[in-house]
Design a protein with these regions (language model features):
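N-terminal secretory signal peptides that target proteins for export/translocation
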Residues: 1-10
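Sequence-level preference for short, compositionally simple segments enriched
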Residues: 2-3, 27-39, 152, 156-528
Length: 528
């Protein structure tokens, strides 16, 4: 019998050999592109150690050059996915503890490949599409998340180091693709200073919400005609939410699942391939999905989520999401969302540390209660949180932080916008602290109670990000709204101008006018 790579008895040797071959293929591929491009990309990059083929002069941007850059990122992502897939097979056989974070990377790479493929299709038609900015920003966030998951495991070994190396290589090429795109967009009159678009006029709903989805959000349960009904007592089509999700037909249409009143002890994952899923409950506190995974319990932050929604077009209405791990469990996510154009409406999200993980892409939260302690709203999406109750609860720490925004690149169109909310809770609460170098958070037209610390915002560690972050306030009220005692950082803006504040509205920040109307959620598109 002929011996091949995949018939060798030692799986560790197979993985080592596969890794060696992938590295050589990557090196050869990079050299060929660099030679054929005649150093086209050698003069422009913020990552001088990344491939020369992923660089270009800012002054000589072309659609072809940008496509070459994205194609290189796509090739890197394919190689990284191949490594991640084979590592997961090896880990299943050996029951290695690295399985969880490599699985995270695999899921995130699948999402990245889909977004990069869309970009290639759009740009080959020479179309200017604002979705490209969101997808590149999210692809970069995915690699940062992969590296974060790997770093959280104490068993970080040579396999993890290999996966981390590929994630860093892909990060470099994605950074340069994003740099090229934003450089070109800045030359266009449609480019806005904040969210990457010019500001749009007020409208009842962001335009990315279709009229049919809008009707669904306001419809009664009887009018919904759900595709599946979940009831613990057996009166529905399924007894568990996971069973109902698995039963949904594949396709691009809207799938509605009604969750009857009750408590469902499940951990759910809606993958990127499962799009346009709508979960509808019977009301806050009536329909409850609860899990208890936590960092202290052995789960990394990404995998700790009670409910994870990665498929685009996710909608949740009238549901309570809970992580019951407790105040000493460290990171314990109740809801993680990496779904583009997602809506969470009239829900409750309850936890302690890291309650709501707004991972990536465009998101909107309305009339939702979000409760937690440390960094209880965090991530790197472009998210507007509007007309919500943000409650800082008593935990194991003396200090609480409402937000920890994770923007790692100045060209990402991401950030947290809190508008017309009530922020209340225990004493010693800060509005936020910078998780990443270019953290961006704005609180505007909201009521801040006396629990807010006079300085308003807190450092993460020393002087980290204090000059590069973007924190702002506009038109707030209540005992904690005075900016007279606020921090004196270069990146803090105590009084945003009207134009600056408009850039963080539903219309200005998440292009809500193009997609929210279809979901049916009530929203304010501009300033109040």
């Amino acid at each position: 019998m002929v011996t091949t790579l995949f018939s060798l008895p030692n799986h560790k040797f197979r993985i080592k050999l596969l890794f060696f071959l992938i590295l050589n293929l990557l090196s050869l591929h990079t050299s060929v592109i660099a030679h054929s491009s005649n150093s086209k990309f050698t003069k422009f990059t913020r990552h001088p150690n990344s491939d020369s083929s992923s660089r270009t002069k800012r002054s000589t941007f072309s659609n072809k050059g940008f496509l070459n850059s994205v194609q290189l990122s796509l090739d890197h992502a394919l190689l990284a996915r191949s490594l991640a897939f084979n590592l997961t097979l090896s880990h299943r056989a050996s029951q290695t503890l690295m399985l969880d974070p490599v699985n995270d990377c695999l899921e995130l790479l699948d999402d990245t490949l889909e977004m990069l493929s869309r970009i290639v299709v759009i740009k080959r038609k020479d179309q200017v599409n604002d979705d490209v900015h969101t997808w590149l920003s999210a692809a970069l966030t995915n690699q940062e998340t992969c590296k974060q998951s790997l770093s959280e495991k104490s068993s970080f070994n040579k396999d993890g180091i290999a996966m981390d190396s590929f994630a860093r290589k892909l990060t470099g090429s994605l950074t340069n693709s994003l740099d090229m795109f934003v450089s070109d967009k800045r030359k266009s009159s449609s480019y806005g200073v904040i969210g990457g678009r010019k500001l749009l006029s007020d409208h009842d709903f962001p335009t990315w919400v279709s009229s049919s989805d809008r009707k669904l959000l306001e419809a009664s349960v009887e009018e919904l005609r759900p595709h599946a009904v979940v009831a613990a007592d057996g009166s529905g089509t399924h007894r568990s939410v996971a069973e109902a999700l698995a039963s949904l037909a594949k396709g691009s249409g809207r799938s509605v699942i009604h969750l009857a009143a009750g408590t469902y002890k499940e951990n759910l994952n809606i993958p990127s391939k499962q799009k346009n899923v709508m979960l509808v409950g019977d009301g806050k506190g009536k329909t409850v999905i609860v899990g208890s995974r936590s960092n202290r319990g052995g789960w990394n932050t990404y995998q700790s989520a009670t409910v994870a929604a990665m498929g685009d077009g996710f909608i949740a209405r009238d549901i309570t999401f809970v992580n019951s791990a407790g105040p000493s469990a460290e990171q314990a996510v109740a809801l993680r969302v990496g779904s583009d154009r997602s809506v969470v409406y009239r829900c409750s999200i309850d936890g302690y540390q890291d309650t709501l993980y707004t991972l990536s892409k465009r998101q909107f939260y309305r009339e939702t209660d979000i409760t937690g302690t440390v960094d209880f709203i965090f991530g790197n999406s472009a998210v507007v949180i509007q007309s919500c109750n943000l409650v800082s609860r008593k935990g194991s720490s003396e200090q609480n932080y409402v937000t920890a925004q994770g923007r790692s690149d100045p060209n990402q169109n991401t950030g947290i916008s809190i508008q017309n909310c009530r922020i209340t809770g225990s004493t010693g609460t800060y509005l936020g602290r910078p998780w990443k170098q270019y953290s961006r958070t704005v609180v505007m037209q909201s009521v801040l109670d006396g629990s807010i610390h006079p300085s308003g915002w807190s450092a993460w560690s020393g002087n980290f990000a204090l000059k590069t972050l973007y924190y702002g306030e506009f038109g707030n009220s209540g005992p904690g709204s005075s900016v007279s005692g606020r921090v004196n950082w270069a990146g803090y803006h105590p009084a945003l101008t009207l134009t600056e504040a408009q850039g963080f509205t539903v219309s200005g920040f998440i292009d809500g006018k193009s997609w929210l109307p279809s979901t049916g959620v009530v929203f304010d598109s501009g300033l109040l």
